[in-house]
């Protein structure tokens, strides 16, 4: 039985005040909102649910695994100084201008165009200015604020395996190195945390079959060609699904679990966000330098950039801090 849940920005606004208590830390993956709402819906029918988390990391499902190397192969021939100039030019053009270009090309060539071309162009422009190798590209793909020093008023930065490249395993395959690092960081620190705390917030237990140790061991024994083939991830899982599920339900673009956060921050969530990002408040609390944050906030409001993820990280810290201060 297939069930769909539709929710609005008002539903999100109802959930947001609960997030600091649900996560008990400044957790900043905006898909935490739909995760909580779908858990709430599932709890009406079951007490235990199965989750497919881990499938992407083990069987090569994320776009970065099969696009990362292609992007780097196209960029690596270009001298860094030229990449930097190209990146600066791309960033100098407003998001709306790139979107208009996409719409014009769509009409001119009778094609589908590129969805959110402006956002994608700005992300590419930022990476052109900073990446020197494929590992740099990977770090840029998984990071929001690339370096915390200009934003956070603190001399100490917590180090993880991502900051210690000398500790990275000697894996020849760029794709499998990304999969390993995601399995060690993104999966436990983001995905599993997000799902477990959102689900337990409504007393729904979740089980993760892909993370059975036998499945993990088996997946890492498989050659990469059984995971990524013809520019498509999770090849082996697809072959199994073809036996049980119509192909039309499988061969679709990866959708993720995102919400229209960029639009909502300019609209129904704006007042909530502006109260948390108040310049005097940021200065008084002393955790952040207001200048780079407010610069991105104003850029976002004006439509000159899509900084939803950068801003959400700060907003979730601010919301958590407000909750802690109110408890005292």
Where are these regions (language model features)?
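Short amphipathic alpha-helical segments and their helix-coil junctions
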Residues: 159-173, 220, 286-305, 324
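Basic, amphipathic alpha-helical recognition segments used for DNA target recognition
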Residues: 184
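PAPS-dependent sulfotransferase catalytic core
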Residues: 245-300, 304
């Amino acid at each position: 039985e297939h069930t769909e849940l539709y929710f609005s920005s008002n539903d999100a606004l109802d959930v947001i005040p609960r997030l600091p208590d649900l996560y008990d830390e400044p957790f900043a993956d905006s898909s935490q909102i739909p995760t909580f709402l779908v858990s709430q819906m599932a709890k009406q029918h079951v007490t235990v649910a199965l989750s497919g988390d881990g499938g992407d990391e083990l069987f090569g499902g994320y776009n970065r695994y099969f696009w990362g190397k292609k992007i780097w192969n196209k960029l690596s021939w270009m001298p860094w100084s030229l990449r930097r100039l190209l990146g600066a030019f791309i960033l100098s053009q407003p998001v709306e201008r790139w979107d208009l270009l996409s719409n014009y090309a769509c009409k001119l060539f009778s094609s589908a165009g590129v969805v959110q071309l402006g956002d994608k162009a700005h992300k590419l422009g930022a990476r052109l200015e900073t990446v020197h190798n494929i590992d740099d590209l990977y770090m840029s793909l998984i990071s929001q604020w690339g370096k915390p020093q200009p934003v956070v008023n603190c001399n100490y930065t917590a180090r993880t395996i991502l900051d210690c490249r000398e500790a990275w395993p000697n894996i020849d395959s760029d794709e499998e190195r990304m999969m390993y690092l995601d399995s060690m960081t993104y999966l436990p620190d983001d995905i599993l945390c997000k799902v477990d705390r959102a689900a337990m917030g409504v007393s729904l237990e979740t089980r993760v079959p892909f993370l059975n140790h036998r499945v993990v061991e088996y997946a890492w024994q498989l050659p990469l060609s059984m995971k990524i083939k013809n520019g498509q991830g999770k090849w082996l899982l697809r072959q199994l699904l073809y036996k049980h599920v119509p192909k039309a339900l499988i061969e679709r673009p990866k959708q993720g679990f995102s919400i229209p956060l960029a639009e909502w921050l300019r609209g129904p969530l704006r007042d909530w966000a502006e109260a948390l990002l108040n310049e005097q408040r940021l200065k008084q609390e002393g955790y952040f330098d207001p200048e780079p944050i407010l610069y991105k906030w104003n850029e976002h409001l004006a439509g000159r950039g899509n900084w939803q993820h950068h801003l959400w990280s700060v907003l979730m810290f601010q919301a958590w801090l407000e909750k802690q201060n109110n408890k005292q």
